[in-house]
Amino acid sequence: MKPSWLQCRKVTGAGTLGAPLPGSPSVRGAAVTRRALVAGFGGRGCRALTTGSGGEYKTHFAASVADPERFWGKAAEQISWYKPWTKTLESRYPPSTSWFVEGMLNICYNAIDRHIENGQGDKIAIIYDSPVTDTKATISYKEVLEQVSKLAGVLVKQGVKKGDTVVIYMPMIPQAIYTMLACARIGAIHSLIFGGFASKELSTRIDHAKPKVVVTASFGIEPGRKVEYIPLLEEALRIGQHRPDRVLIYSRPNMEKVPLMSGRDLDWEEEMAKAQSHDCVPVLSEHPLYILYTSGTTGLPKGVVRPTGGYAVMLNWTMSSIYGLKPGEVWWAASDLGWVVGHSYICYGPLLHGNTTVLYEGKPVGTPDAGAYFRVLAEHGVAALFTAPTAIRAIRQQDPGAALGKQYSLTRFKTLFVAGERCDVETLEWSKKVFRVPVLDHWWQTETGSPITASCIGLGNSKTPPPGQAGKCVPGYNVMILDDNMQKLKARSLGNIVVKLPLPPGAFSGLWKNQEAFKHLYFEKFPGYYDTMDAGYMDEEGYLYVMSRVDDVINVAGHRISAGAIEESVLSHGTVADCAVVGKEDPLKGHVPLALCVLKKDVNASEEQVLEEIVKHVRQSIGPVAAFRNAVFVKQLPKTRSGKIPRSTLSALVNGKPYKVTPTIEDPSIFGHIEEVLKQAV
C-alpha cells in the first residue's frame, strides 16, 4: 500500500482532523478533538513536555504513573499516524504490554519525510566524521530521503516485504543508517550486527533471524588496520544453516573492490543507480522495527524485539524532556550503531526530533589523539554529547590535564550525558572540570531502549545532582528497590532494582522466537515487575544509585558489598586510572574483593606503596566490612565495544575457572596478560 501523505497529515495523534474520537478521553488518553500535529523544526511540540521546573518533573512523573494512557497519548500526538489507535494501552496479557493498539504509522516517514514536508529538507540530518579515513560530510534531510527511498526500492526489488528480516553488517558509515531507515520504510525488520563481529557469532545470529537479505560493506577501519568483512561473512554463511537470497555489498571508496559471487551478491552502487524510489509502508504500532541481539547469552540467542509505535513516541519525547534539545540543534551519541545507544540515539531519536546527528567513525583516543572528542564538539557545534564513562577515562589516562582539548572552543556545548556503565565520581568530576558543562549520568538497558532513570533537564530536573547517582525515575518508569522476598526497602538500602508494570512505550515487546525466555528471565522472579537484574539503592530525594549487576554483588562473610562501590573508592584514589573489582573465593569469608587496577601514567610510587594506600583509602571510605586487602596491577582492562567490563568473565578467570571471551571484547589478548599477572601475584 502506498501511503497518502495528505491522509498522513490529516490523521495524526489518534483521530482525524477536527473529528470527535470514539470512546471516552480516559480510555483514549486524549482530548475529545484533535488537530493534526506534524512536528517541525520550529515547533515546540507538547509545551508541558519540553520545559519547566523541578515541580514540573514531579507533576509529569505522577501523571505518567497515575494515568499512563492519557500521559503517553498526549506525547503520541507529536508523531504522525496513518490510522488512529483504538486503545492507548492494552495490558490484558501481562507481562506483555501493547501501546497505541491498531494505530498505524511509519517511523521512516516520521524521521525523514515529514521534516522535508515542513520545509526543512535542506537542514543537515547527518554529520559524518571519520578520522580513520580522513573524511567529513554533511548530509541534508533531502539527501537522506533520496538514498533511503532508493535503497528501499532495491530491497523490494529483491523480494523483501513487510515482516521479512534483513541483517545489516556494516561499519560506522552513513550507508548503515540508510539501510536501517530503508528497512523501516518498507516494514522490514532489521537486525544490525557489529561490523567485524566474529564469524561464529554472526552465523548464530543469521541462523536465528533468517534474513532474506544481508547488507554489508567491503571493509571496516580500526586504528592502524583494515577489517575485511566479506571473508568473515563468507565463513559465517559456510558454518551456518541459513542462506540469504541476496548479499548487498557496499564497496568503500578509495579501497579495492571485493569479488562478487554470481547469483547471490549485488553491488550497492550498481543497484542504486537503477533503483526506483519507494514510498513508506504503514505498519501497526506493535510491528517489530528491529531485532537487537545482546551479548553473553547461552542457548538460543537473546534477540530484543522493538515495537515501532511506542519506540517512535518515546524517543521523540526523550530528546526534549530528558536531553533538553530543541529541533535543529546538533547532537552526538559517541557510540556504535551496533549497540542500543546507536539504534536509539545515533539513528532514530535525533532524526525523529529534527536534530542533526553526528556519526563518528573513530575512537576517543588514537584517532589521532586524546583531543579527538574536543575537536568534534568544536567543529560541528555540538550542543549535547552522550558517551560512556570508559571513553572519558581513556582520554584522561592519556591526557590527564586535557591539554589537547584546550585549543578548541566549545561555545555551543551545553551538556555531557554518560551511560553504559556506572560512572565513578572521580571521572564525573574530571569531566566537569575539562568540558566545563554539567555532566549527567543516567541509566538504561538494551531491553528498555531509552533511559529508565535520568536528570530530565527538559522537565526542570537539576543539572547538579548529587555525585554517584544515575538520575530520578523517567516518567513511565516506576522504579522500586525490593529485597529477594519482594519487600520494599527503605532509602539507601541495597537491593534489587525493579520496575512496576506496565512498562512505558518503547520498551521491548519480547525476545525474537523465544517468548518463554522473555517471561522467565524478566518477569518471574518478581511478579508484577520487570526485573532489571541490577542492584542499587534510592536516596531520600528519589535519586537512584546503580551499584552493579545483581551477579556482581560480593557476599563477604554474609555482608552484601557492591563491587561498584569498591571500584568507585579505588578510582577516587589519585593513582588509579581504571579499575574492576570481582569476588575472589575465600575459605573463611566465602568471597573477598580483588581489584584489578590500571595505574595512571605519571605514578612514580611502587606498586606495593600504591596497594597499601588504596587499601587504607577503601577502609576509610567503605569500612573494614569490605575486607579489601588485595589488588593486582595490569596494563589494561578488557572492555566490550560499548565500554563495559566483562566482570563475570574476569571473575571466572580470577577464580581459576573456565571462561569464555565474548566476541564483543575489543582486545581478547588482555585476558592472557591478566592471567600472567595473577600467576606472578600468587
UniProtKB/Swiss-Prot annotation:
PTM-bearing positions, type N6-acetyllysine: 519
InterPro entries: ACAS_N, AMP-bd_C, AMP-bd_C_sf, AMP-binding_CS, AMP-dep_synth/lig_dom, ANL_N_sf
Alphabetized PROSITE patterns for the sequence: AMP_BINDING (PS00455)
Location(s), subcellular: Mitochondrion matrix
Catalytic activity line of the entry: acetate + ATP + CoA = acetyl-CoA + AMP + diphosphate; propanoate + ATP + CoA = propanoyl-CoA + AMP + diphosphate; butanoate + ATP + CoA = butanoyl-CoA + AMP + diphosphate
Catalytic activity, EC: 6.2.1.1, 6.2.1.17
Gene Ontology cellular component terms for the protein in this record: mitochondrial matrix; mitochondrion
Name the UniProt record assigns to this protein: Acyl-CoA synthetase short-chain family member 3, mitochondrial
Organism of this sequence: Mus musculus (Mouse)
Lineage: Eukaryota, Metazoa, Chordata, Craniata, Vertebrata
Gene (name only): Acss3
